[in-house]
Amino acid sequence: RDLHLSIRRQRQMCIRDRREVAALFNDLIAEPLATSGDDASRDKEVASGLSFSGLSQMSLVELGYQHAEESWAAVADFLDSTWVAALQPEGRRRLEAFLPLLCEMAGATREPDSALTRSLPFVRAVCRRSAYLVLLQENPRALRHLLTLVASSIWLSERLAARPELVDELLHESTLYSAPSRDELHALVRQQLLRIPEEDLEAQMSALSRIKDGVILRVAASELTGTLPIMKVSDNLTFLAEVMIEQALAVARAELVQRYGEPQSDRAGFAVIAYGKLGGLELSYGSDLDLVFVFDGADGETAGPKVMDNTRFYTRLAQRVVHVLSAQTYAGRLYEVDLRLRPDGDSGLVATTLPALRRYQLESAWVWEHQALVRTRVVAGDLALKTSLEALRREVLAMPREQSELASAVCDMRDKMRAEHTASSNRRERFDLKRDPGGIVDIEFVVQYLVLAHAGEHAELTVWSDVIRLLEALERTGLIAANEAKMLSQAYLDYRSATHSLGLQGRAAETDAAEFEAQRQQVKQITEALLPGLQAG
């Protein structure tokens, strides 16, 4: 208690002269404590140890901290917290040994203040599992990795504090700054799930969450150190999501088949279509999964202990896949899942049949739904159904369209998006990388328009779902000049790279308006020429 009162007094005086505060802190810590008996004597020893062999605000100055006053105040707040007060003597002794090393090694990083203050929430998270402190103390290279990463990314520091078990990844330097291949991911998943009983669904879901968190840490570390460019970052995050979806489908299907048996039909099959960022191979760290579930063979029933018609089976399967992907477990959740792009949106069925999807896309879908179809891929499911869905996508994209009506519909949708955005944020001095004129959405809309307008004459426009390769295809077909395609591609990559960097700092995807002004004006000029009226709003 005396220790906490002393530190509270110290924190209140941090606004005074640094030398005076440091000296006063050391004097206060050294005051005798009003305790008695062996336990009290041991507490006194631990409390006295919390002066950390002379560690003070001035020692942070000597270690190279640029904002020693603020950093020392953060340390004082940490020491004055209920977390530290509740520690058992062993945990306090471990903290006593660890914190000076933390301050010293943070001082050796490029950003000592950020490294120290952002690492304290992680230290707090592991205080009651203080073996982690010993682990880091005995593995200084792992501690150095921790400090470097949290100093580089506030998002990553928060993630490590929320999932302190990720410290295990820091011990494996050979893999920390490299992302696993798809085959390695499959092997890792198999290895982890083999240890878990098939009937323990929550344990399987938790294992998948831990695998996902570990891989995301590796991808983020690789991006922060420059070993992965933006497209490779998105590729790896996309591969990770696909493996998780495949595994969620396998787990959910095995559970249902055990109870109801396999669906019986010549055409029986189930598939998962990815839309949006996942469909376009552009997933980022916090992206939702936009999914649509499709099945075929609705006219049969299962052959198992309990009979169920195929429609109910596949609907239940879709629901279970969503559950595995999005339910909260003690290890967290995998992803947020969004099903609103299915036929008829929120009012539509969770899973739709292939014939119903075909009718909807050819007869009822809005232009914006065909725009969304440009960025779709089948990411899991039965091969025969996947082939049928890919053929349907090509057919819909290649439908004959009156270009002026198409252009008007695309521009109207862009105007609606722009109006909604302007209503919520009307700051001329800022540039929303995604939604503002000359940003990401304008590039995506002009690409989608050109695909829908010309896929009937140029089949290669239906092959890819990502913007960069679609721009390359548009250049090859002569629909975009080479210099324009190059400029739009570079702007798109620059915008996305900035979006990722801002996300890793826990910030919204916007910058000062002047930062991308030249690129933004070029994008507006090119997209307006390719799609007259796009910039009119």
Predicted feature descriptions by range:
Residues 1, 9-537:
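A nucleotide- and high-energy phosphate-metabolite-utilizing enzyme signature
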